[in-house]
């Protein structure tokens, strides 16, 4: 896990519980490929993880950590002693199994579970999240900022 200081990501102070912004000025396409090894201006999975962490900071959580992308046990964001979270920047909706995985980790650590998804959730996943006590959020990128929204009441009530 790594702290977020110095990563060039800022939180929208007008509405930290709604939108998390990453400064984004699209460079030329050739430069993107040389710098990041990809053609697209679409943020990568790491950008989504950082945006989710910034959102949690905007809610008032302190010492939010972002996983290093290695064997993190499915934990992409963490607030030690408070919560664990997973972030999926996939095109497909998230089903129940990934929610069960993060809920299991949260239960073992005695903390809350949250999940951030770019594509949303299946109906079964949303229904299961209530019983599994997982706060659900969608996370999207539009032009130059990330938008994070609570999907269920557990997500909407998340407090430090």
Regions inferred by a protein language model and the residue ranges of each:
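Mixed-charge (Asp/Glu-Lys/Arg
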Residues: 1-160
């Amino acid at each position: 896990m790594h702290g977020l200081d110095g990563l060039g990501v800022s939180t929208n102070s007008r509405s930290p519980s709604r939108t998390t912004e990453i400064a984004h000025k699209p460079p030329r396409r050739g430069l993107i490929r040389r710098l990041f090894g990809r053609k697209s201006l679409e943020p990568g999975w790491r950008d989504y993880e950082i945006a989710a962490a910034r959102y949690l900071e905007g809610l008032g959580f302190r010492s939010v950590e972002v996983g290093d992308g290695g064997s993190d046990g499915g934990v992409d964001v963490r607030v030690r002693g408070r919560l664990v979270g997973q972030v999926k920047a996939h095109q497909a909706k998230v089903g129940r199994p990934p929610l069960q995985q993060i809920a299991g980790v949260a239960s073992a650590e005695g903390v809350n579970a949250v999940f951030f998804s770019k594509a949303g959730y299946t109906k079964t996943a949303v229904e299961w999240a209530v019983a599994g006590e997982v706060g659900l959020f969608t996370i999207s990128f539009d032009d130059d900022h990330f938008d994070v929204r609570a999907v269920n009441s557990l997500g909407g009530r998340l407090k430090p």
